[in-house]
Structure formats: C-alpha cells, structure tokens
C-alpha cells in the first residue's frame, strides 16, 4: 500500500498512539507480550474499497483494573486526536475490543482517501 501524505500522517499518528499505550498499559509492558499488526484492502462489489488495519495485543497475564480501564475506553489526548483524524479527516472508523489479557483495535478508512494510487492493483498470477 502506497500512502499519500494524509494517510502517512494519520497512520503515523495511529502507530505512535497505539505503541505508546502498549508500552504504558498493555502487552509491551511485560515480557512475553505479543503484538500482531496486519492490514488488508477490503473490496466489495458496489462499495468503495477500504484499507483495514488491525492491531492485536496479548499479555501473558491479565491486565490490572486501571490499565484495563485505560485500554478499554478512557480517552487521553492522543486517543482523542487519533479518533478525530480517522473519523473526521478520513471518514473512517476505529473499533476496539478489550479482553482480560489485551485489546484488538481495527481502523478502517476509505482506500482512496489515504493512497496515492486509488486504483487497486491486482496481483499477478505466477
């Protein structure tokens, strides 16, 4: 995926905010924590293509109540800024699902709003 300036700024902010929270409150705080990051382009007939980023953290032991509260919805300045950027500037969405040992965050944005190549390239068959 080749991002344009707006997409680069938005996803740079997203990675910074999510990594900061992982270090302070989440899976990166303790040895054995796991972080999985994936992205895909979702294309459905009759709908605009979307870029979908998933961030999944898992800690080897349950989070304490205060950390779970922060990861589960208490919004600091960085999270509010990220939300405003993804929803307001890009017309996308952010969802987060908290579990006892981690959090899953999904960011979905219109593909044509964040890429310098709005047409989806088909992979060549080998």
Indicate where each model-derived feature is located:
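Conserved short strand/loop->alpha-helix "switch" segment adjacent to the catalytic nucleotide/phosphoryl-transfer site
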Residues: 1-19, 23-34
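C-terminal end segment of the histidine kinase catalytic
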Residues: 108-126
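A short coil/beta-turn micro-motif at the C-terminal edge
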Residues: 29, 41-43, 98-102, 111, ...
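Glycine-rich nucleotide-binding loop
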Residues: 50, 61, 99-106
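Glycine-rich/acidic phosphate-handling loop/turn and adjacent ATP-lid/helix
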Residues: 39-80
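Glycine-rich ATP-binding loops of the HATPase_c
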Residues: 89-99
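A short, conserved alpha-helix near the extreme C-terminus of the histidine kinase catalytic
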Residues: 79-88
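Short beta-strand patches within cytosolic ATPase/nucleotide-binding catalytic cores
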Residues: 36-38, 95-97, 106
């Amino acid at each position: 995926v080749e991002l344009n300036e707006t997409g680069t700024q938005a996803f740079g902010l997203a990675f910074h905010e999510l990594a900061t929270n992982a270090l302070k409150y989440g899976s990166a705080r303790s040895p054995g924590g796991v972080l999985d990051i994936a992205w895909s382009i979702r294309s459905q007939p009759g709908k605009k293509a979307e870029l979908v980023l998933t961030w999944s953290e898992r800690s080897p032991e349950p989070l304490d109540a205060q950390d779970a509260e922060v990861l589960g919805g208490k919004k600091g300045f960085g999270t509010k800024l990220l939300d405003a950027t993804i929803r307001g500037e890009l017309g996308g969405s952010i969802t987060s699902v908290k579990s006892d040992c981690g959090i899953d965050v999904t960011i979905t944005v219109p593909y044509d709003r964040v890429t310098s190549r709005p047409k989806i390239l088909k992979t060549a068959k080998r």
